[in-house]
Amino acid sequence: YFLVDAEKFLQRKDLIYTGRTLFGAMPPKGQELDDHYFGTIRQRIAAFMRDVNIELWKVGVSSKTQHNEVAPAQHELAPIYAEANIAVDHNQIVMQTLKRIACEHGMKCLLHEKPFAGVNGSGKHDNWSIITDDGINMLDPGTTPHENIQFLLVLTCILKAVNKQACLLIESSADPGNDHRL
């Protein structure tokens, strides 16, 4: 997600109406130095992140990490893993909370995949795994060649399915916003 000062946000009708810039100059400098990514979190942003965490904890959503991301004003929050349907709900709660708490801190939270041209975009996704009802992780490679058999078989099946059903996967996941982000 990106955080921008609310006063600056309100000066941009394109941000207000679309959640991203539609015109304007490219950034004067790219992301070559990683100064934002490896920099310390500014106090205002840290206070925002703290308040977001408090609100999320109240509704049972815990985040594993939060940090600066590569692009200027870009940040990340990663919720703790959960079953897919719960994780999707958590993502929705997180996005609503980010927007609400940003307003309380005099900022706007941009959740568009690519709010600014010339810098990294943001992605919202759910990781997945395959676990049996007994709790066995089917994607655990194990530590011995014998333990690798199950992992290799499952991985081979996944790769075969992705190769065979590539068009269906693309149709179910591609959209203009995601293509623009990449």
Model-derived features: positions:
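Glycine-rich, acidic/polar active-site loops that bind/position phosphate-bearing ligands
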Residues: 2-111, 116-182
